Amino acid sequence: MKKATFITCLLAVLLVSNPIVVNAEVAGLIPCKDSAAFNKRMVNSVKKLQARLAKYDANTPPALALNKQIEKTKTRFATYGRAGLLCGTDGLPHLISDGRWSRAGDFVFPGLLFLYITGWIGWVGRGYLLSVAKTSKPTEKEIILDVPLAVKFMSSGFAWPLAAWQEFSSGQLIAPNDDITVSPR
């Protein structure tokens, strides 16, 4: 019985985790370097900056800043073209999340960074509220922040995954059922 359950679970995992390959042509996307709309966007962006540049004398601070911005714009579009991003008919890059590992870097790193930052904010806020709850006027300190105390929690929040795991494994993270109020229905 255990063997049959194991094989069934294994087959289910293999069927669910099998990525479906998406053709870019089917979705109407083409590589940005080959997209006429993408190249037109680059030309238009550079033309707008050059039109602004014409209003200033050469070697003035605004002219130098605009020249630098023109170079950055050209570099940005060239980087998008080399990165293998796919563009739609609007000329804008689109992210493909179809299960291919070659595209994972486009959204996995930003996603993990988002989760880390939101976890940091939540962990720091939780620590601040737990600390303030022990003071004589907790409601006042929730409305008017105690900045030195908040900064103390913010500076120690970078290690929140380790602190959360430590509190979870010691049983401090989860409140006992007696401490959780139930509202009347």
Swiss-Prot record:
> Any one cellular component term from GO for this entry?
photosystem I reaction center
Q: Which family does it belong to?
A: Belongs to the PsaF family.
Q: Does the keyword Signal apply?
A: yes
Q: Where is the signal peptide?
A: 1-24
Q: What does this protein do?
A: Probably participates in efficiency of electron transfer from plastocyanin to P700 (or cytochrome c553 in algae and cyanobacteria). This plastocyanin-docking protein contributes to the specific association of plastocyanin to PSI.
Q: Which GO terms describe its biological process?
A: photosynthesis
Q: Name the Gene3D superfamilies on file.
A: Photosystem I PsaF, reaction centre subunit III
Which compartments is it annotated to reside in?
Answer: Plastid, Chloroplast thylakoid membrane
To which species is this protein native? Porphyra purpurea (Red seaweed)
How does the protein's chain sit in the membrane according to the entry?
A: Multi-pass membrane protein
Q: Which UniProt keywords apply?
A: Chloroplast, Membrane, Photosynthesis, Photosystem I, Plastid, Signal, Thylakoid, Transmembrane, Transmembrane helix
Q: Which named protein is this?
A: Photosystem I reaction center subunit III
Annotated membrane-spanning segments are: 104-124, 143-163
Q: What is its main location?
A: plastid
GN (gene name): psaF
